[in-house]
Design a protein with these regions (language model features):
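M14 metallocarboxypeptidase catalytic domain recognition
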Residues: 1-104
């Protein structure tokens, strides 16, 4: 049970509540990205590679979209979410990718 009173927040953990996340915004997890990449309008139109790995061993994805075959007229580098609290940038970038792919 969570309570916000005055300028404080209090949460009482329930039985079996082993994994709980508090967030200042709408969380954007790896599951969100994987679900987005499986959308019919996205699947096959985005190339996914591993750019690097984090210190904890997680993949940092590199997404390429647009002119995948041949030389593109332009190259644009977009980046989002340098820190876990910057999840809104991931939603914005997802929307931008969807808009570009919708132009095809």
């Amino acid at each position: 049970r969570a309570v916000v009173q005055n300028r404080t927040f209090r949460h009482t953990f329930g039985a079996g509540e082993d994994d709980l996340r508090f967030s200042v915004g709408m969380p954007y997890t790896a599951e969100h990205l994987h679900a987005f990449l499986q959308l019919p309008t996205v699947r096959g139109a985005v190339r996914v590679e591993t750019l690097t790995r984090t210190a904890k061993g997680r993949d940092v994805e590199l997404l390429t979209f647009g002119q995948l075959a041949g030389a593109p007229r332009f190259r644009i580098f977009l980046t989002a979410r340098h820190h876990a609290c910057e999840m809104m940038a991931s939603y914005a970038l997802e929307g931008l990718i969807a808009a570009v792919l919708a132009e095809k």
